[in-house]
């Protein structure tokens, strides 16, 4: 996991920019320097992990199976702590790097696709060649461009409240965020600070999203993918990519939590007769924000 994301980015960059190295892409402004550094750090970590797997298995195997994780962790100088095993600490870092690499590569692939759409004369396998962009009227400073939410003013600097508004719109409409908006949000994450977290406006906006029956997990997952959720709720940030080798957690704690809320969304949207009783009980809850917040925090 992870390395193939980078390979795809490099292959695509050769087609769209004629460049196939991060250094070249940074120099022409295709990738911000901060993203290139994060990609390089993730690539370095994942390559060392793959090499350790090859050394331990004495063959070209890229499968990081459970029985190898503890020894790979030891070889990479991880040690047990009173709270966690070395393998859990190692896998936490592994998932962080793989997650970051996937998100960064996905963002830049979206940007490359958008660039190709704007220059249909340069047709390639990567271009969808739309004849024109479809733009919906602006609402609250945001617009819909070809089904993606974007800022109406491309020079706007977002703050925490504006980002919360964007997530709320995306949750309500089911729209994706444009690559440009995602990058703008990444740059604005420092504004998600203690002052913003403590504001009544932020609390009310977040609780409103938790009351959107059947759509809660989608909004939270989008927040999480862009690192907003962990900044807004530092307690959740601390369990991001947290691995627990026990009988209860097949996934990392953050993924386990989001899947739990997705199960509740599935119940709200279900028409199955076998779930009718549970759906009826759920429909009687006047304010589901407390329930969703409890699920969000149940493993913290």
Kindly give the residue locations of the regions a language model identified.
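Core mixed alpha/beta domains of very large multi-subunit molecular machines
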Residues: 231-243, 256-258, 263-266, 270, ...
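Structural motif corresponding to the C-terminal cap of alpha-helices
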Residues: 14, 174, 268-272, 299-300
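Non-catalytic interface/linker regions that flank or bridge core catalytic/transmembrane domains
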Residues: 1-249
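Alpha-helix N-cap/helix-start motif at coil-to-helix transitions, marked by capping-box chemistry
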Residues: 16, 40-43, 251-254, 258, ...
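Helical catalytic core of nucleic-acid polymerases
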Residues: 197, 201, 207, 227, ...
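His-Asp-centered metal-binding catalytic motifs of divalent-metal-dependent phosphohydrolases/nucleases
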Residues: 6, 49, 223, 260, ...
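Histidine/acidic-rich helix-loop-helix segments that form or flank divalent-metal centers
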Residues: 243, 247-249, 272-287
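Histidine-centered active-site/metal-ligand motif
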Residues: 245, 249, 255-256, 298
């Amino acid at each position: 996991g992870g390395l193939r994301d980078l390979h795809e980015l490099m292959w695509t960059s050769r087609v769209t920019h004629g460049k196939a190295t991060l250094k070249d892409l940074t120099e022409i402004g295709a990738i911000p320097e901060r993203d290139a550094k994060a990609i390089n750090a993730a690539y370095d970590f994942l390559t060392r992990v793959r090499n350790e797997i090859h050394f331990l298995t004495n063959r070209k195997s890229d499968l990081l199976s459970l029985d190898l994780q503890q020894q790979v962790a030891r070889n990479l100088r991880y040690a047990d702590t009173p709270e966690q095993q070395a393998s859990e600490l190692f896998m936490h870092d592994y998932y962080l790097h793989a997650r970051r690499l996937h998100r960064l590569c996905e963002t830049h692939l979206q940007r490359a696709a958008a660039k190709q759409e704007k220059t249909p004369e340069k047709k390639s396998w990567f271009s969808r060649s739309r004849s024109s962009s479809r733009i919906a009227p602006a609402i609250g400073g945001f617009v819909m461009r070809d089904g993606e939410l974007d800022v109406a003013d491309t020079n706007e600097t977002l703050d925490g409240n504006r980002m919360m508004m964007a997530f709320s719109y995306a949750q309500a409409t089911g729209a994706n965020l444009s690559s440009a908006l995602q990058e703008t949000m990444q740059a604005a994450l420092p504004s998600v600070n203690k002052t913003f977290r403590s504001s009544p406006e932020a609390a009310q906006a977040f609780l409103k999203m938790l009351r959107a029956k059947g759509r809660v997990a989608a909004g939270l997952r989008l927040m999480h993918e862009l690192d907003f959720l962990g900044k807004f709720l530092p307690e959740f940030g601390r369990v991001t990519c947290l691995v627990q080798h026990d009988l209860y957690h097949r996934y990392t704690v953050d993924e386990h939590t989001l899947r739990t809320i997705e199960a509740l969304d599935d119940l709200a949207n279900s028409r199955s007769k076998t779930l009718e009783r549970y759906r009826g009980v759920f429909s009687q809850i006047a304010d589901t924000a407390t329930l969703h917040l409890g699920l969000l925090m149940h493993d913290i």
